């Protein structure tokens, strides 16, 4: 899929030529899972799969939206007044961004026809919703001279998720999608929002995305429950030590103060947040140093913690990761994203990718009963206007 596909679709849908094209990628997180709402570090990158849009103006004072993925045409009419309440549809993400940007001072002076199509598997944990949010933010900011900085668009997207969609997500997804750079990952301190770009040099290895094809509904999953558990654990720790977030603690500091947390489940949740943050720092340094063996071990250790301390995997993800680690040429593997379905990643020697996909796919099909899908990820730039 590319911009030509959406410009052709735009003409078929609206009967005229598109004036602009845009793209927003999906994302994978190399390591640093469920740390973004705990004041820790994350290490994501944008990928070449994503969401495209072809856009043209109209004189209807309306946003006419068509999604090729859902094969639905939608009409948002109140671009000069108040928007409708959310309806549990894909249009909520467009409308949510428009509402937040309008509140922040955006001035929508005319209508738009927007044709959207993407190649991110829906519900796969590659951030299709955040990709759509950042796509919309880029479109509206560009075509209405919004003047918003990229980090402002990131915060608008988080606000849409938290206040409009109803998901207590952190900042990582929108940040990675808006701020991504080709062939680089971003080490982001979510506590301070300081970040640095680090080259992803894998040598003879590639990143293989493994899609369980089990949909995960973020708002309906236990994502919000995990965040609440971490907040409870932090509150207990704060009764005995001065700490603002779990991400501020070292492993030793956490181990010395676990007696403050009375619930063994909460200890497990907080331990993941603390230790995952430290793993992320170690992994980013290992990648900088060209120590891919250590990097792979830390990626795999993250997966173990997500399965046993944070308990966000499940039989589908566990089957993929366990069998991935048995294959020749694999440096590391783990789930990526919020969990409860969705995707995992593996770092695989390029010479072994074909056998890897055949073997892991066969075992998955035999155990789960349906196919997993595999993609070799290219690390891409963030959201942008294409023409």
From Swiss-Prot:
It is found in: Cytoplasm. The lineage of its organism: Bacteria, Bacillati, Bacillota, Bacilli, Lactobacillales. Mg(2+) binds at residues 129, 161. NCBIfam families: gal_kin, PRK05322.1. Pathway: Carbohydrate metabolism; galactose metabolism. ATP binds at residues 67, 123-129. Its main location: cytoplasm. One of its GO terms (cellular component) is cytosol. HAMAP family: Galactokinase (MF_00246). The gene is galK. One of its GO terms (biological process) is galactose metabolic process. This is Galactokinase. One of its GO terms (molecular function) is galactokinase activity. Keywords: ATP-binding, Carbohydrate metabolism, Cytoplasm, Galactose metabolism, Kinase, Magnesium, Metal-binding, Nucleotide-binding, Transferase. Pfam families: GalKase_gal_bdg (PF10509), GHMP_kinases_C (PF08544), GHMP_kinases_N (PF00288). SUPFAM superfamilies: GHMP Kinase, C-terminal domain (SSF55060), Ribosomal protein S5 domain 2-like (SSF54211). Its EC number is 2.7.1.6. The active site is at residue 173. It catalyses: alpha-D-galactose + ATP = alpha-D-galactose 1-phosphate + ADP + H(+). The record marks 27 as: Transition state stabilizer. Belongs to the GHMP kinase family. GalK subfamily. It is an enzyme of class 2 (transferase). Catalyzes the transfer of the gamma-phosphate of ATP to D-galactose to form alpha-D-galactose-1-phosphate (Gal-1-P). Substrate binds at residues 33-36, 223.
């Amino acid at each position: 899929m590319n911009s030509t596909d959406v410009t052709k679709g735009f003409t078929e849908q609206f009967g005229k030529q598109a004036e602009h094209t845009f793209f927003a990628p999906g994302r994978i997180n190399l390591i640093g899972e469920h740390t973004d709402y705990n004041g820790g570090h994350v290490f994501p990158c944008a990928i070449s799969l994503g969401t495209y849009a072809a856009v043209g103006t109209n004189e209807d004072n309306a946003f006419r939206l068509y999604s090729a993925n859902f094969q639905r045409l939608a009409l948002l009419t109140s671009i000069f007044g108040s928007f409708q309440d959310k309806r549990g549809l894909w249009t909520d993400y467009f409308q949510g961004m428009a509402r937040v940007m309008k509140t922040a001072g955006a001035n929508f002076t005319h209508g738009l026809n927007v044709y959207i199509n993407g190649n991110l598997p829906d519900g796969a944990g590659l951030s299709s919703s955040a990709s759509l949010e950042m796509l919309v933010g880029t479109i509206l900011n560009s075509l209405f001279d919004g003047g918003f900085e990229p980090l402002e668009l990131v915060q608008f997207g988080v606000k849409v998720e938290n206040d409009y969609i109803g998901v207590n997500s952190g900042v990582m997804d929108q940040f990675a999608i808006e701020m991504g750079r080709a062939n680089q990952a971003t080490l982001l301190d979510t506590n301070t929002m300081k970040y640095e770009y680090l080259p992803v040099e894998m040598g003879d290895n590639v990143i293989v995305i493994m899609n369980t094809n089990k949909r995960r509904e973020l708002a309906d999953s236990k994502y919000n429950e995990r965040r609440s558990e971490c907040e409870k654990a932090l509150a207990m720790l704060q009764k005995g030590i001065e700490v603002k977030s779990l991400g501020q603690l070292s492993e030793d500091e956490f181990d010395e103060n676990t007696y403050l947390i009375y619930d063994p489940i909460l200890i497990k949740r907080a331990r993941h947040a603390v230790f995952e943050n430290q793993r992320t720092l170690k992994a980013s340094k290992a990648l900088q140093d060209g120590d891919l063996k250590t990097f792979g071990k830390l990626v795999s250790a993250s997966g173990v913690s997500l399965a046993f301390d944070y308990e966000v995997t499940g039989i589908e993800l566990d089957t993929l990761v366990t069998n991935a680690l048995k294959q020749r040429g694999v440096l590391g593997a783990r789930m990526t994203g919020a969990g409860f379905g969705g995707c995992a990643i593996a770092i695989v020697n390029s010479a072994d990718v074909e056998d890897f996909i055949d073997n892991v796919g066969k075992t998955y099909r035999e155990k789960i009963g349906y196919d997993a899908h595999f993609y070799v990820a290219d690390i891409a730039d963030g959201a942008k206007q294409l023409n």
